[in-house]
């Protein structure tokens, strides 16, 4: 990835890793400038976040990547109807402050269905709450990074095809 640092073609390169702390994640952290990590609004997600912070410290201590930092935390699978979701968000914000994005990604049936159709949520249910949240997240990410880029709004398909349940 080193050539990408000097190549002005790309503003950002995202390395999307599986949700494990294995060798793929370690290699991605060795190559990354910062980590943007999704955290589910679930009790055990807090333990996972602690493990991620420790892994970042290990990468820094090993000398594999001295630039690496925890750049942001995105709260996902948020259900506003539950106290648990609200409490997890509050706890993570208390401990990590500004690193936690304001945008939260809601729990959504459509979001769960999209991969089984080989589509992103922006393609599968472009006008639904989850797609709107991901657009808001992209705008917030670019604002935080001072990027002049804009979020490309995908054309909306008829609302009847996009209704989230």
Name what the model sees in each region.
Residues 6-109:
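Conserved catalytic-core segment of NTP-binding enzymes
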Residues 61-165:
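C-terminal lobe/tail of nucleotide-utilizing enzymes
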């Amino acid at each position: 990835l080193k050539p990408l640092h000097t190549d002005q073609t790309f503003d950002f390169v995202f390395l999307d890793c599986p949700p494990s702390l294995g060798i793929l994640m370690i290699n991605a952290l060795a190559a990354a400038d910062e980590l943007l990590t999704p955290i589910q609004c679930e009790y055990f997600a807090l333990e996972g976040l602690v493990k991620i912070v420790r892994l970042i410290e290990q990468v820094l201590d090993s000398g594999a990547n001295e630039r690496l930092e925890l750049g942001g935390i995105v709260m996902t699978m948020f259900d506003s109807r539950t106290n648990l979701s609200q409490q997890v968000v509050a706890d993570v914000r208390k401990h990590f402050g500004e690193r936690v994005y304001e945008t939260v990604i809601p729990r959504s049936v459509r979001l769960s269905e999209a991969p089984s159709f080989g589509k992103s949520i922006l393609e599968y249910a472009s006008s639904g709450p989850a797609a709107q949240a991901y657009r808001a997240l992209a705008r917030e990410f670019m604002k935080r990074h001072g990027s002049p880029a804009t979020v490309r709004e995908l054309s909306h398909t008829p609302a009847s095809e996009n209704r989230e349940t």
